[in-house]
Amino acid sequence: MTKADFISLVAQTAGLTKKDATTATDAVISTITDVLAKGDSISFIGFGTFSTQERAAREARVPSTGKTIKVPATRVAKFKVGKNLKEAVAKASGKKKK
């Protein structure tokens, strides 16, 4: 699904115009981005938690050349799936919860 498809679905589901749905979607994405850029996390109970995590420096190999390179330490975004989302996806795929 593309962002445009998502916006159309949000507009239809919430009874909004596409312009309002675009504004709302852009605001949510921008806010989540700003929160993560500050190193904070944001939780939506049942849906999941967006957070950041430090990734240590490491050595990696370039598959095409076999050359080893050093990858610097960095902070990356991560998402932990919430219970309700996990169950909804499992139910939709026909799999049972472990």
Swiss-Prot record:
Q: Which InterPro entries match?
A: Hist_DNA-bd, IHF-like_DNA-bd_dom_sf
The record ties this protein, via CDD domains, to:
HU
- What GO molecular function terms would the record report? DNA binding; structural constituent of chromatin
Q: Which GO terms describe its cellular component?
A: cytosol
- Supply the alphabetized keyword list: DNA condensation, DNA-binding
Q: What Gene Ontology biological process does one annotation of this record name?
A: chromosome condensation
| Alphabetized SUPFAM superfamilies for the sequence | IHF-like DNA-binding proteins
What start and end residues bound the annotated signal peptide? none
Q: Which Pfam families match?
A: Bac_DNA_binding
The protein's job, in short, is: Histone-like DNA-binding protein which is capable of wrapping DNA to stabilize it, and thus to prevent its denaturation under extreme environmental conditions.
Assembly mode: Homodimer.
UniProt name for this protein: DNA-binding protein HU
| Organism this protein belongs to | Campylobacter jejuni subsp. jejuni serotype O:2 (strain ATCC 700819 / NCTC 11168)
Q: What's the encoding gene here?
A: hup
